[in-house]
Each structure stands twice: as C-alpha cells, then as structure tokens.
Amino acid sequence: MSTSVAGVLAVALLVAALWVTYRPFGDYMYRVFAAKRHLRVERAIYRLTGVNPDTGQRWPVYARSVLAFSLVSVLLLYLLQRVQEHLPLNLGFGAVGPALAWNTAVSFMTNTNWQAYSGESTMGHTVQMTGLAVQNFVSAAVGIAVAIAVVRGFARRRAPVAVGGPGGPNGPGGPGGPNGPGAGSRDDVIGTGDELGNFWVDLTRTVIRILLPVCVIAAIVLVAGGAIQNLHGNRVVSTLAGGHQTITGGPVASQEAIKEFGTNGGGFYNVNSAHPFENPTSWTNLVEIFLLLAIAFSLPRTFGRMVGDRRQGLAIVAVMAVLALGSFAVNAAFQTAHHGTVPVAVGAATEGTDTRFGVPNSALFASATTLTSTGAVNSFHDSYTSLGGATLLFNMMLGEVAPGGTGSGLYGMLVLAVVTVFVAGLMIGRTPEYLGKKIGSREIKFASLYFLATPAIALLGTGVAMGLPGERASMLNSGAHGLSEVLYAFTSAANNNGSAFGGISVNTTWYNTALGLAMLFGRLLPMLLVLGMAGSFARQHPVPATAGTLPTHRPQFAGMLGAIALIIVALTFFPALALGPLAEGIH
C-alpha cells in the first residue's frame, strides 16, 4: 500500500471514529456536568478541601478560583523541580535550574507543555509522575471547566418567579417541573441565576469522570501497541555495531495517554511521539491523533445539549471540521509538491519524517497537533517545506478553534460566533442576538479584547526577541526562516500549543522567562475575558426569537463563522507571515 493511500485511509478512519463518538461522548459529558449527585470520592475531596459543592459562583468568583488554582499549581510544580535531587526515583538528576523550572511549571500549568529540555535527561520519574502528569490532567480539566462555565452563561435564564413554586419554572405545573414538558431536563441543569457553576466541582468531575477513565483505557491500548510502562532507569545496552547506547525507561504509556487526550503535548522523550517507546506503530499513531481530537470535537454536542438546541452544536462542529480538513489538505499538498531534487526523487519532502508514518500520516499528525493545543509531534516541523510550515503556523494563529484544545477550542469558537452575529447585525441594522441573549457594547468589548490578547503577546514577544542582539545570537538560522522560527516559538507559547520549529537555543534565562510570561498571559487573559463575557450574558433575560433573528444553526451562518475566523487571522498576522514563511516560500 502506498503512503498516499495509507494517508487517505487514515483520514477516513479518523473522521469515521470522531463522527461515531461525537454523539455518545458529547452526551456523556453533558450528563457529567448535569448530574445532581456527587460520587463518594468527589464528596471526600470536597470535605478534604472545604468546598461546598452546592454553592454556585458568579463569574468574578469563578475567575478568582481559576487564577488561584493555576498560580498554586505553578508554585508546587516549580518547587518539585527545585528539590528533585532529594526525591526518590530521580535517576541521578539534580535540581532543575530556576529559569527552566519556572518555564516548565508555567508550561504544564497552562496546558502548553513547551519543553526547553530533554525529558529523558532532565526529569526523574517522581517529577514526571507527580508533577508533570498531574498537571496534564488538571490543566486540561481547567480548560473544560471554563468552557462549561461559558456555555452556562449563554444558557442561563433569569426568572423572577419563585423556583419550585406552583407557577415557577420548576414547580408542579411549570415547564421544568415534574409534570411539565421539560420535566427536569434543562433548568435543573443550567439554573436560573447568574452563577456560572462551581469551578471546584467542574474541575473534580472532569478529572474523575472524564479524563481518568478514558486515559486508563488508552494507556492499556498503547501498551498493547508497544509503548512502554515501567519504572526502569537508564540502561546501557550493546548495539549491533559493537557500540553502547543508553536507553531510558519509565511510565511512558500512562503519560502518553493524557498527553494526547488532554491536548497537552509534552513528551516523556525529547523527540516526543516520534520515539518508538511513545508511539510504536502506525496504528498507535492513529489512536493518538484520535485521542487529541476526541474531546474538542465532542464538546460542541455538549454545548448543543446545554443550550437546548443540538443544531447549534452541529453548526459549530461543522465549521471546526471544514477548517481542520482544509488545513490538512493544504499541508499535505505542500509536503508533496515535489520542489527540489530530493523531493522529486523520493516523491515528497521526507526530511524530518519517520519512515514508519510517511509524509501523509506525519502531515495529519502535525495538522491535528497545531489545530488543537496539543503541540505533540511525530515529525520535525522545522524540516517542513516553507509553505507547509506556514500552514502549521497559521493553524495556531487561528486561535486553535478548529477544533482547538480541551475547552479552549469551544469557548474560542463561541467568541467567534458572538463576533459573527455582531457583524451580521450591523449589516442588517438589527440589535445582534445569540442564543436569545443580546450582544451589547460590554459583550463585544470582551470579545474584541479576547482576539487582541493572544496576537499582541505573540507579535510583541517576536519583535522584542528580534530586536535584542543577545537574543538574536540564540538563532541558528538567519533571514526569513530565522524569523519564522522565532515567530513560531512565541505563537506556540501565546496560544498554549507547545510545538516548536527548533533552530533556536531557547534554554536561556531570557527565553525561559519571556516564553513563560507569554504562556501565562496567553492562557489566563483569554480565560478571564471569556468568563467576563459569559457573566455578562448570564445576567440577561432571554429575548424571544423574532422573524428578524439571525438563525445561527444554518449553513449560511456556519459559512460566515468560518470566514470571520480566517479574516481575523489574515488581518492580524499577514505582515508577519509575509516577512517569514511566505517570503521564504516565494524565494
């Protein structure tokens, strides 16, 4: 079977698997956050931490909880790295330096997993298991929790009548009451106040009911495929050529599962998913791609269930799918364009790819990992053709909404939907409404700042790095490609992706500090802004739909939504792209 046929087959299987799981997995996540009962282990956690799980939080309280948990996570992971030499299973590694420890702590807390170090030669098993792997779970859970809180903001109904009374929405004769048509289906789940839920409950449920069960199964599947899972240290073995090689073992499969499923991306080994201990075969490669896309492509179904209109979720996921498939097609085309002597001879640009996967499956993995916030790699992105690499860069510049990271993809797409409805409202001269909520100046300010925050961080960081002579010395390439590498690094950090072009010596005090700040603000600023927007929507009374209301579930709206996403990227990043990968491609 040729690699092209294998690539087409892999895409077909992947699309089929995602479509089959879209409904059941999306419905399952809906039931997780709709459930009134708490599991016994959850109640124990709430008692231990002093959390009242039945108390709702308005958006400022929810946001403060996110900030507090995130900053404590950074501190604990930083301290764990700094005392590594005193920990068991440290494999003889000493304490991680202050700048690198800061960068790594922020990286894993923000779900970025940017790695300025080689995992097998820097981190011992204790730090890997109790620090990095734990953050892989909770950072993904934070993103999902924020997404669910944002959806609640759109779905909330403020009702002045007494809840539970005869005429109230949950009373005996009310629409959500036991005898009403809604019979406990929606108001019981969403509520009628302006609270966005309880962050600690959302976080706990996400980890225990969603991430842990799937990752246990996924780890077993990966072990069956050849991924390793042990507590071995470094072993020196004799090679066939008569030399010696050091092989590092460790709890790889368990970390690989959450690395992909939580769209984290940080590898146990320096070469990430190109290492045969992490990603042994072509079918485990497909399993890993499925894992990193599963949550992001199923959350729109959860969204549709929560807002009471499943068609809204279908419209969102359709835009995600079209953008994702288009990106893969363009990237694969650029990688097989046959420009140059070697690509013509072998049929594709194979530098930096693994022969186990070939160009199509490498391009598929690269597209999936940059369209989400994963950042894992099974090929060397810096070796892609200039326009192939530009496609990966463009994927991150989209804000990773096609489908995006765990949670961040959904709430990013919802902010895009708000902007799209606002633009459409301006064109027809009506007050814009989305899901029964009016979009006023307050909401559009939050949305505008959301789309300005990440590009500003990425472009400012790139500009400063290019302007400092000392930091330019860290670049191993000059010209357009050198600019592309720096732009890629800060775009990856600001968008919490974590993949890299390489070509830069980033384990320096300046780069560790600057990229750490880019990751921190790139994660927390958009979260705070989108929670503020959700809180503003939650305070509103729903507006009944009229003949002039824009239908947001139809193909016309989906087309506008995709166009707005592309236009925002083009207007924001085109000058930088023109100076970097586009200039290199034309040359």
From Swiss-Prot:
Chief location category: membrane
Positions with biased composition (Gly residues): 164-183
GO cellular component: plasma membrane
Pfam families with a match to the protein in the record: KdpA
Domain of life: Bacteria
Membrane topology, from the record: Multi-pass membrane protein
Region (Disordered): 162-188
Molecular function via GO: P-type potassium transmembrane transporter activity; potassium ion binding
Subcellular location field: Cell membrane
Transmembrane helix among keywords: yes
The entry's keywords: Cell membrane, Ion transport, Membrane, Potassium, Potassium transport, Transmembrane, Transmembrane helix, Transport
Transmembrane annotation, as ranges: 1-21, 60-80, 89-109, 131-151, 208-228, 280-300, 314-334, 409-429, 449-469, 514-534, 557-577
Subunit structure: The system is composed of three essential subunits: KdpA, KdpB and KdpC.
Protein role: Part of the high-affinity ATP-driven potassium transport (or Kdp) system, which catalyzes the hydrolysis of ATP coupled with the electrogenic transport of potassium into the cytoplasm. This subunit binds the extracellular potassium ions and delivers the ions to the membrane domain of KdpB through an intramembrane tunnel.
UniProt cross-references to PANTHER family, sorted A to Z: POTASSIUM-TRANSPORTING ATPASE A CHAIN, POTASSIUM-TRANSPORTING ATPASE POTASSIUM-BINDING SUBUNIT
Family listed: Belongs to the KdpA family.
Full protein name: Potassium-transporting ATPase potassium-binding subunit
Gene expressing this chain: kdpA
